């Protein structure tokens, strides 16, 4: 009887740890696009930054991301070590001159974002990140807010 409570407690913890049974990202701090039971790594890159008056333009090389999805409300998984899931923001690029660009200004544009995200903690360091609204076809990037220019790019077609 003396051991019954600790055994029940440990059993409860083991069951709770196994709640999420889906795929798990192989690398930390990388966003993976979920397609059924498959994980597709997003295009991880560093955006170059250029500032003019009230505008800041972020640029990524290439007219299109090689990572594509037909889903208007894509779902991503993140195994977090350095990147905090709640700092992620979703933006839409404009394609100009063979490059993807995002210009942020004091005059906010709902067309480029940030778009609403829903973030759900699945496990100790595992998060589900999903667009909380239907997105139009185009080029997009998830990026942690702050001083980083890291961009996790994908295309909706």
Q: Where on the chain are the PLM-derived regions?
A:
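Sec-dependent N-terminal signal peptides
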Residues: 3-13
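Alpha-helix C-terminal capping segments
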Residues: 8, 141-143
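Primarily secretory-pathway and cell-envelope proteins
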Residues: 18-102, 146-157
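Residue-level marker for the onset of beta-strands and adjacent loop->beta junctions
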Residues: 74, 115-116, 125, 150
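A short local loop/turn or secondary-structure capping micro-motif enriched for an aromatic residue
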Residues: 98, 109-111, 137-139, 150-151
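Extended, solvent-exposed segments with strong compositional bias
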Residues: 102-124
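Generic structural detector for well-ordered beta-strands
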Residues: 118, 128-130, 153-155
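A glycine-anchored, Pro-Gly-centered beta-turn/N-cap motif
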Residues: 125, 131-141
């Amino acid at each position: 009887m003396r051991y019954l409570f600790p055994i029940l407690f440990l059993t409860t913890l083991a069951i709770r740890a196994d709640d999420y049974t889906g795929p798990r990202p192989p690398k930390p701090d990388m966003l993976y696009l979920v397609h059924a039971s498959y994980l597709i790594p997003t295009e991880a890159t560093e955006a170059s930054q250029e500032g003019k008056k009230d505008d800041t333009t972020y640029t990524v090389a290439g007219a299109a991301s090689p990572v594509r999805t037909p889903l208007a409300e894509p779902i991503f998984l993140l195994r977090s070590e350095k990147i905090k899931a709640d700092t992620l923001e979703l933006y839409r690029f404009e394609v100009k001159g063979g490059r993807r660009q995002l210009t942020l200004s004091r005059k906010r544009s709902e067309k480029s974002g940030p778009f609403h995200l829903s973030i759900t903690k699945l496990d100790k360091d595992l998060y589900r990140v999903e667009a909380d609204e239907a997105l139009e076809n185009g080029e997009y990037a998830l990026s942690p807010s702050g001083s980083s220019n890291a961009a996790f790019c994908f295309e909706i077609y």
